[in-house]
């Protein structure tokens, strides 16, 4: 059994894709937590709980921001590895999400070093819905990619007969 550089790339990508799936699942859980915190009518009228809700939103947004750049870098590494391994079909499948990540990164708010997920704007229902839909779409993409990479690991490993 001989491993090629492409097989190594697929194996590494398989492991990193699993970590991206966990990142995105955490995003979905965090957005759902923000949504339920936003919709709870009993807690909306409680002023003593308001400060705690604001701190919770700030904490969640801070944690979300810490996962954005690693996600973008890992996906950029995928594209770089597939380009070096001359896996053009796989690179072509990953390029649209890479361009979206670049667009999203370069169109972040200009008022600071924060990439996105501002505590004030995230509580806007439209922005929260957009972020949640984006997370579900990314989860679908990463899950499909995971199984594609799993298939390609087996397809790129060549068995050498004796």
From Swiss-Prot:
Residues 1-10, 94-138 are cytoplasmic. Keywords: Membrane, Transmembrane, Transmembrane helix. Residues 32-72, 162 are lumenal. It comes from the Eukaryota. Disulfide bonds: none annotated. It is a multi-pass membrane protein. The keyword Transmembrane applies. GO terms for molecular function: signaling receptor binding. SMART domains: Cornichon (SM01398). It is found in: Membrane. The keyword Membrane applies. One of its GO terms (cellular component) is dendrite. The chain crosses the membrane at residues 11-31, 73-93, 139-161. PANTHER family: CORNICHON-RELATED (PTHR12290). Regulates the trafficking and gating properties of AMPA-selective glutamate receptors (AMPARs). Belongs to the cornichon family. This is Protein cornichon homolog 2. It comes from Xenopus laevis. The lineage of its organism: Eukaryota, Metazoa, Chordata, Craniata, Vertebrata.
